[in-house]
């Protein structure tokens, strides 16, 4: 690594952000399988996109079709999966985008490691705190049934622990209220911290 140096681009993050008229940020949605992470992140992205924001949604299942298709579900592979996603998200934020990432990301250490790569104002942890009982009842992919039967090992929430965030910027239980209200809470927060400026906030009203 001693012969590898960081190449400084002539166009920096600030210039890209100014061109897009937005403040780049990473929203990291974490929670159990079936908690509603992808649904919530997708609905927020749609709202932001329609209001003129430049966005991208990184989804836990989708990245395993390409970027992380060589990885399994051992502890080491899960760590590497999130490390790669964190690096990609950082590049996207540097490109001036509003990035939404929906991953179980079960340990605080994993999430804190990704947080540490970003300025304080550019990492927002969203804990989708839907209870296990609700997630298991939903079971959209049939994974809890397989985990309970022993067909899937090391399944978060059943045979592997989930460490809830201690100080997430936002906590949303998708079993309470409706999706519109939940997305509104996210938009209000982003407006309060000036990720969404006053002009674009009107388009989201």
UniProtKB/Swiss-Prot annotation:
Origin organism of this chain? Shewanella baltica (strain OS195)
Which UniProt keywords are present, listed alphabetically?
ATP-binding, Kinase, Nucleotide-binding, Phosphoprotein, Transferase
Family designation: Belongs to the APS kinase family.
Q: Which reaction does it catalyse?
A: adenosine 5'-phosphosulfate + ATP = 3'-phosphoadenylyl sulfate + ADP + H(+)
Sorted alphabetically, the Gene Ontology BP terms of this entry are:
hydrogen sulfide biosynthetic process; sulfate assimilation
Hey, which pathway is this one from? Sulfur metabolism; hydrogen sulfide biosynthesis; sulfite from sulfate: step 2/3
One example of the protein's molecular function in GO is:
ATP binding
Give me the gene this protein comes from.
Answer: cysC
- Pfam families cross-referenced by the UniProt entry: APS_kinase
What is the stated purpose of this protein? Catalyzes the synthesis of activated sulfate.
Q: Where along this sequence does the record place binding of ATP?
A: 31-38
What is the protein name for this chain? Adenylyl-sulfate kinase
PANTHER family the record matches: ADENYLYL-SULFATE KINASE 1, CHLOROPLASTIC, BIFUNCTIONAL 3'-PHOSPHOADENOSINE 5'-PHOSPHOSULFATE SYNTHASE
Active-site positions on this chain: 105
Q: What is its EC number?
A: 2.7.1.25
CDD domains membership: APSK
């Amino acid at each position: 690594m001693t012969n590898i140096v960081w190449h400084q681009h002539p166009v920096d993050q600030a210039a890209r952000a100014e061109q897009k008229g937005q403040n780049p940020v990473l929203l990291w949605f974490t929670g159990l399988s079936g908690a509603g992470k992808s649904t919530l992140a997708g609905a927020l992205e749609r709202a932001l996109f329609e209001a003129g924001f430049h966005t991208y949604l990184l989804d836990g299942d989708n990245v395993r079709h390409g970027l992380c298709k060589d990885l399994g579900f051992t502890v080491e592979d899960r760590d590497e999966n999130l490390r790669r996603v964190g690096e990609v998200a950082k590049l996207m934020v540097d490109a001036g985008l509003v990035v939404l990432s929906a991953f179980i990301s079960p340990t605080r250490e994993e999430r804190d490691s990704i947080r540490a790569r970003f300025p304080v104002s550019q990492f927002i942890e969203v804990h989708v705190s839907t209870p296990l009982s609700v997630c298991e009842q939903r079971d959209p992919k049939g994974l809890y049934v397989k985990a309970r039967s022993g067909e899937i090992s090391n399944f978060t929430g059943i045979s592997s622990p989930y460490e809830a965030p201690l100080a997430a910027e936002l906590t949303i239980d998708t079993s309470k209220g409706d999706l519109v209200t939940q997305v509104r809470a996210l938009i209000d927060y982003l407006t309060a911290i000036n990720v969404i400026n006053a002009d674009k906030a009107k388009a989201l009203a």
